[in-house]
């Protein structure tokens, strides 16, 4: 009857007709230059209609064995969660041509066990309380780098665990957060940031009776931590960890008075005055560069005004256009002024997060203009923004403040203090639902050069075809510290394309990441599948360049490129799965 047929020596097949039937899933077979041959199996347990559990096992002929589990549940709107755990046992392996560095020997020749935990939870308790939790934790960064299929996961430098509870009490929004995050710089240095706990109380704006004024309040208690960790290996490959730690308790209160002015349609003015009071139980001795037990406090006022307008607009009809019957161009200039009173003890404050890095005795003037182009489509009949162009620059009376301006991506790159920030340009275009693109760049007006440029976009043709692309470049600027070292420049291109034809019976994926600066592919991946009425097959091939991880890992061996091949079969009513390292483009999802 024209139904394709294939044979396997052994096949297990649950006969239940329920789409969520309990049973074994189809295994995945693979081969890797680094991991050896692999076999991945999974058992799916449909506990109930609202929860399930998947147990997984991976066998690698060279890299050992792994066990994993994924639990998912949905109790109702706003109450759901998932948790994934994985344990990997790697035997002692000495790869040919391993680097002679002591650290590389220790990483490549000794057996080790590692684990990872990933999860999200969101739970509502009544109508006023919500609990959230998130975990993205791994015990060994080198496992992430060498096992993960997704390059974003392989180059992930941070691991984090966080929990948060919010509630509304007597008109106030309360939040309690406990978080811990570690960011790696290579596999021998890292920085830890955390709060245990961070408790905040916030009131919404309330009008003052009889006056056009609004008042709000924010207060916070936080026990914050920042650690610098470095690991050095001795002659026997045994690591020695050095720790530099800063921690303190902090009390912060911030009342705000806002004065709006919205009587003119073509121009709006919002002004506010805030008082900030902060106390730290510990401080920083600038001469000895050490944390001391003496407390320190800080008090300052902040005055802020933002003008938007005058807004100019022009509308014109296009009766002969097949795209839109009418266009509108809106020009929206804006300027804001912010004055922060003097902070005389800035050098005595421990710099742990953003609140601690505020500089005083300065004025910031921010100015920019936004152009918006809107079109009334003939088909949909509604107006959509097809193009927007936004430019922004800040001026500070204190040049030091530009080094802490989080509105600009290049502020924390070791550039010399300057009163003018670069000009930020963001262009977004979306002429249809199927096409969109974004361009971002920062231009240094002092040196007449672009610091960074990035662009990304998407083109799709319904469910049949979709492609995304991205480009980013960190450019060389002669004389500008942080951008005048050619070895630290970056230039990347990435793309991902998927297609589905014949009612999704045939499809495929191709994606790549290319390092233009060093003229090499970081990774290339090809996936193809065929689904018939009764069965199907999925094949995947990936070439992953370990040399692209040179800025993160000291692990070096003769395997410069890991070539990975995976294959899996499907049958009607019997699903397949992706292991924890993302074969077939997933991340533990079946």
What are these regions (language model features)?
Residues 1-590:
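Outer-membrane beta-barrel proteins and related beta-barrel translocases across Gram-negative bacteria
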């Amino acid at each position: 009857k024209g139904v394709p047929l294939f044979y396997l020596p052994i096949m297990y097949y649950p006969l239940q007709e329920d789409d969520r039937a309990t049973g074994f899933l189809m295994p995945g077979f693979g081969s890797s230059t680094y991991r050896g041959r692999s076999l991945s199996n999974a058992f799916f347990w449909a506990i109930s209609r609202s929860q399930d559990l998947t147990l997984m096992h991976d066998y690698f002929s060279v890299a050992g064995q792994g066990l994993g589990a994924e639990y998912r549940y949905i109790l109702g709107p706003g109450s759901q969660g998932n948790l994934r755990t994985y344990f990997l046992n790697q035997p002692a392996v000495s790869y040919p041509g391993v680097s002679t560095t002591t650290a590389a020997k220790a990483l490549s020749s000794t057996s080790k066990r590692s684990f990872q935990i990933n999860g999200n939870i969101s739970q509502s308790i009544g109508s006023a309380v919500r609990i959230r939790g998130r975990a993205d934790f791994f015990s060994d960064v080198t496992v992430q780098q060498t096992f993960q299929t997704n390059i974003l996961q392989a180059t992930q430098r941070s691991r984090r665990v966080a929990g948060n509870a919010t509630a509304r009490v007597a008109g106030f929004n309360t939040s309690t957060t406990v978080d811990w995050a570690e960011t790696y710089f290579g596999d021998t240095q890292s920085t830890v940031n955390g709060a245990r706990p961070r408790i905040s109380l916030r009131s919404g704006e309330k009008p003052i009776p009889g006056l056009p004024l609004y008042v709000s309040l924010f207060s916070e208690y936080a026990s914050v931590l920042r650690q610098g960790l470095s690991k050095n290996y001795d002659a026997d490959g045994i690591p020695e960890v050095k720790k530099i730690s800063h921690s303190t308790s902090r009390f912060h209160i911030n009342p705000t008075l806002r004065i709006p002015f919205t009587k003119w349609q073509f121009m709006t003015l919002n002004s506010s005055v805030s008082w900030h009071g902060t106390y730290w139980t510990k401080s920083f001795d600038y001469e000895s560069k050490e944390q001391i037990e003496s407390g320190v406090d800080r008090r300052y006022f902040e005055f802020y005004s933002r003008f938007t307008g005058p807004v100019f607009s022009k509308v014109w009809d296009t009766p002969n256009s097949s795209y839109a019957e009418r266009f509108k161009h809106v020009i929206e200039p804006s300027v804001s002024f912010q004055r922060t009173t003097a902070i005389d003890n800035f050098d005595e404050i421990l710099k742990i997060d953003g609140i601690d890095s505020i500089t005083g005795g300065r004025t910031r003037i921010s100015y920019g203009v936004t152009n918006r182009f809107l079109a009334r489509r003939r088909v949909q009949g509604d107006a959509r923004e097809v193009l927007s162009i936004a430019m922004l620059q800040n001026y500070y009376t204190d040049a030091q403040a530009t080094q802490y301006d989080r509105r600009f991506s290049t502020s924390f790159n070791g550039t010399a203090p300057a009163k003018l920030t670069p000009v930020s340009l963001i262009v977004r275009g979306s002429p249809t639902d199927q096409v969109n693109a974004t361009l971002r760049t920062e231009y240094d007006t002092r040196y007449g050069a672009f610091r960074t440029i990035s662009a990304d976009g998407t083109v799709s043709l319904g469910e049949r075809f979709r492609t995304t692309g991205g480009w980013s470049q960190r450019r060389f600027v002669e004389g500008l510290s942080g951008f005048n070292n050619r070895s630290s420049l970056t230039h990347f291109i990435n793309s991902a394309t998927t297609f589905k034809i014949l009612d999704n019976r045939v499809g495929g994926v191709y994606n790549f990441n290319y390092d233009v600066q060093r003229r090499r592919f970081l990774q290339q991946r090809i996936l193809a599948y065929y689904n018939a009425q009764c069965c199907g097959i999925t094949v995947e091939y990936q070439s992953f360049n370990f040399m692209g991880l040179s800025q993160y890992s000291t692990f070096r061996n003769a395997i410069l490129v890991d070539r990975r091949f995976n294959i899996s079969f499907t049958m009607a009513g019997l699903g397949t799965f992706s292991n924890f390292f993302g074969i077939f483009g997933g991340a533990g999802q079946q």
